[in-house]
Curated annotation (Swiss-Prot):
Organism of provenance: Bacillus anthracis
EC number: 2.4.1.-
Name of the protein: N-acetyl-alpha-D-glucosaminyl L-malate synthase
Subunit structure, interactors included: Dimer of tetramers.
Catalytic function, reaction form: (S)-malate + UDP-N-acetyl-alpha-D-glucosamine = (S)-malyl N-acetyl-alpha-D-glucosaminide + UDP + H(+)
Protein encoded by which gene: bshA
Record's function text: Involved in bacillithiol (BSH) biosynthesis. Catalyzes the first step of the pathway, the formation of N-acetylglucosaminylmalate (GlcNAc-Mal) from UDP-N-acetylglucosamine (UDP-GlcNAc) and L-malate.
Biological-process GO terms, alphabetical: bacillithiol biosynthetic process
Transmembrane spans: none
Family: Belongs to the glycosyltransferase group 1 family. Glycosyltransferase 4 subfamily.
Molecular function GO terms recorded: glycosyltransferase activity; nucleotide binding
Binding-site positions, (S)-malate: 16, 94, 122
């Protein structure tokens, strides 16, 4: 049975927006009718896709409201689209505001549409720590028909911080193997002025404090004393200027390339030798999957969902938050040992295929959809 599914996510380059959009694209390929209900066109919807429809949430400014009422506009648009298109499911990414908006939409139309909510991290680890929002998050979770989270770690944090009376299933993030794969990037290296002998380290993030980009730079400054290497810093955000100054202070400007925001990073990853993700909080770490699919070993911090992605000593290394010396030592060992690097990169690719391939994860979501729609009495959808 083909389903009609509404998907709401942030249309930006963050992990939740990427996963929500890629999930919709994969479901559409399977013949389901997908309706994106978002404040802007998701950046991964960069062409016309069969079975995919976009409904923009327009937020008007009224003098009676101190701030533009995004939540109300979204709930209204959800109800409108769900009723007109006869949607079976609203799949929302983030407990607040999206699960709350879905609940309001369901109450407005009075129909038996099902709500699936996926927790991604910030909605729990940051917002869940705010006492003024805690009850609201719990309500959004408990009013959803099914709740998933992107890691076991996030489920544990949800129960610890929010304490919902709700079962939560782990459904890992995934990547499209047709986009992220190992390939020869010799020409691209030349275009960036990187020689064949130089190793390439890469970090991709939104440059917020929680990502600890300064640790990436500090570790790299130690690494280049032993290894001829370049560091690609991909992204932008509040800490960008601070990191720029740090690079200057460490006198490694000629070793670091600031590439800014990049919508499509697959080629940059395929060109790289090592990924560094040294966050102090990370519910999953989608960029790790993207790198591993390209045969790139990763070094990550032992926090949140990262240990569920990186198998220490097998597909990469884990370190403690702030241990830049440990990161540097592991990186130097790996980059100097060609056989170790090659074997670890291959095992990283195999791990992605075994645990995080799109076919497997999208099928898990399909099963969730069918189960939640199944009639308890006669077993029919």
């Amino acid at each position: 049975m083909k389903l009609k599914i509404g998907i709401t996510c942030y249309p930006s380059v963050g992990g939740s927006g990427v996963v929500g959009t890629e999930l919709g694209k994969q479901l559409a390929e399977r013949g389901h009718e997908i309706h994106f209900i978002t404040s802007g066109l998701p950046f991964r919807l960069n062409k016309v896709y069969p079975n995919i429809y976009f409904h923009e949430v327009t937020v008007n400014q009224y003098s009676v409201f101190q701030y533009p009422p995004y939540d109300l506009a979204l709930a209204s648009k959800m109800a409108e689209v769900a009723q007109r298109e006869n949607l079976d499911i609203l799949h929302v990414h983030y407990a607040i505001p999206h699960a709350i908006c879905a609940y309001l939409a369901k109450q407005m139309i009075g129909e038996r549409i099902k709500i699936v909510t996926t927790l991604h991290g910030t909605d729990i680890t940051v917002l869940g720590s705010d006492p003024s929002l805690n009850n609201l998050i719990r309500f959004g979770i408990e009013q959803s028909d099914v709740v998933t989270a992107v890691s076991h770690s996030l489920i544990n944090e949800t129960h610890e911080l929010v304490k919902p009376n709700k079962d939560i299933q782990t459904v890992y993030n995934f990547i499209d193997e047709r986009v992220y794969f190992k390939r020869d990037m010799t020409q691209l290296k030349k275009e960036y002025g990187i020689s064949e002998s130089e190793k390439i380290l890469i970090h991709i993030s939104n440059f917020r404090k929680v990502k600890r980009v300064q640790d990436v730079v500090q570790a790299f400054a130690k690494i280049v004393t032993e290894v001829d290497a370049k560091l690609l810093l991909v992204g932008d955000g509040p800490e960008f200027c601070t990191i720029l100054q740090l690079v200057k202070n460490l006198h490694i400007e000629d070793r670091v390339l600031f590439l800014g925001k990049q919508d499509n990073v697959a080629e940059l990853l395929a060109m790289s030798d090592l990924m560094l993700l040294l966050s102090e909080k990370e519910s999953f770490g989608l960029v790790l999957l993207e790198a591993m699919a390209c045969g790139v070993p990763c070094i990550g911090t032992r926090v949140g969902g990262i240990p569920e992605v990186i198998q220490h000593g097998d597909t990469g290394y884990l370190c403690e938050v702030g241990d830049t010396t440990g990161v540097a030592d592991q990186a130097i060992q790996l980059l100097k040992d060609e056989e170790l690097h090659r074997n670890m990169g291959e095992r990283a690719r195999e791990s992605v295929y075994e645990q995080f391939r799109s076919e497997k994860i999208v099928s898990q979501y399909e099963t969730i959809y069918y189960d939640v729609l199944r009639d308890d009495k006669n077993g029919k959808i």
